[in-house]
A protein has these predicted regions:
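Short loop-to-helix capping motifs
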Residues: 58, 122-124
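Short, basic, alpha-helical segments at the C-terminal edge of helix-turn-helix-like DNA-binding modules
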Residues: 68-74
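Amphipathic alpha-helical packing segments from all-alpha helical-bundle domains
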Residues: 75-76, 80, 105-114, 124-151, ...
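Hydrophobic/aromatic-rich alpha-helical bundle segments in the mid-to-C-terminal region
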Residues: 125-131, 135, 149-198, 205-208
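Short coil/turn segments at alpha/beta junctions that flank glycine-rich nucleotide-binding fingerprints
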Residues: 30-31, 85, 106, 151
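Helix-turn-helix
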Residues: 19, 23, 27-65
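Hydrophobic alpha-helical connector segments
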Residues: 65, 76-110, 160-167, 188
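N-terminal intrinsically disordered/low-complexity leader segments
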Residues: 1-15, 22, 26, 204-208
Length: 208
């Protein structure tokens, strides 16, 4: 096989891999993990069953990659806002706004996001792609909160790492809430209320 043929084969390989991931994401949204079979994924992707093991090693690894992509697309706009150069309070509010916008535009993705949390609870490997994304979220949130505290914008008693974990818990809880009670308090209200409470903590006398 010459260089041109190898490059052509590489392009075909890349396309098949992407189709499998996209097909898996579609199946997860519509069927959930339990009812997403290898055969269904292959049929949806227009690939043969052997392609799953060829590109990913197993269906489990393919599902993990698909869930990681689902989470990454949902959370990346917020991460971009958090890592910006604006005032930390503005970055935090912008990140919340980005999450709200994605949530509103992609409500059909809520079932797949629920599967992300279930998968993360079952597979706690630090090398697992979903764990890597959550770690990035924690680190960036913690950095912004630490900067807010250093600038005396929030109470000094607030621990950045613990608050970052709490915010992630609120994010996950909001997804669950929207899934089981779509007519209840809206995600915009929940997110805005939480941010307001955090940013108001300095004036509330909770600092030490």
């Amino acid at each position: 096989m010459n260089i041109t043929q190898r490059r052509s084969a590489g392009r075909r390989d890349s396309g098949a891999r992407e189709r499998l991931v996209l097909a898996t994401r579609t199946c997860l949204r519509e069927r959930g993990v339990v009812d997403t079979s290898s055969r269904l994924i292959a049929q949806t992707a227009g690939e043969n069953l052997g392609a799953i093991t060829y590109y990913f090693g197993s269906k489990a690894q393919l599902v993990a990659a698909a869930l990681a992509d689902e989470l990454s697309e949902w959370i990346q706009p917020a991460l971009d806002a958090l890592s910006g150069s604006a005032d930390p309070a503005v970055r935090l509010v912008d990140a919340i706004g980005a999450l709200n916008a994605t949530f509103e535009a992609q409500r059909a993705r809520v079932p797949a996001l629920l599967e992300v949390f279930v998968h993360a609870a079952r597979d706690r490997s630090s090398h697992e792609p979903i764990a890597a994304i959550w770690t990035d979220v924690h680190v960036q949130l913690g950095a912004v909160i630490a900067e807010l505290r250093a600038r005396d914008r929030i109470a000094r008693g607030i621990d950045p790492e613990a608050m970052a974990a709490l915010i992630v818990a609120v994010i996950a809880g909001t997804v669950v809430h929207e899934a089981i009670d779509p007519g209840g308090a809206q995600h915009q209200q929940i997110a805005t209320q939480f941010a307001a409470l955090l940013l108001a903590s300095r004036s509330g006398g909770a600092h030490s």
